[in-house]
Amino acid sequence: VPSPAISEKMEEFGKRVEDYSARTRAGRIAGYSASIFGNVVLLIFLSFFHQYIAWYHIEPDGSVTRLSMLTSDYFAWLPILVTALVISVAANIIMIIYDRYWFREIIQIILTVIGVVVVANLVSIFPFDFSVIPNATAVDITPIAVTIFLIIVAVGLGVGALVRFIKLIVSLVKQSPS
């Protein structure tokens, strides 16, 4: 029989663990909710307001001219993005309902791989026309800079998916009875 001091410490420890679990679960739900909100905002903006991705020029008479930076190839990439955003929203809703470590990690790995596919397709299709920028140097440099940035994003996402996968495997190996 543990002494009263040890029993109190064990009970206090148990409460702290429960508090921590509740906070982290609440934090994950907040994260899932923020992700859902962000994905819906992106879905709406990039589907219905893409024409505002443009170079704006103020004319001498005060009017504003909007020159689109997107080519018609944007509409070849848009279904890929919309599909990924819808999958992400659905996955985050599912994770709010069912929140287990192994499930969460698998879903996050899948979503990250989908992100790599979306970014890789964006680089491949490259639906941008930077010729509307009035600076010749910027017109030459911007496509290169955007391509490099997108490749770095894709590689970063790929590394993130790999790290999550390794952590998941290590966690599962530690949990399996030997």
Where are the regions a protein language model picked out?
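Alpha-helical membrane-embedded segments
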Residues: 147-164
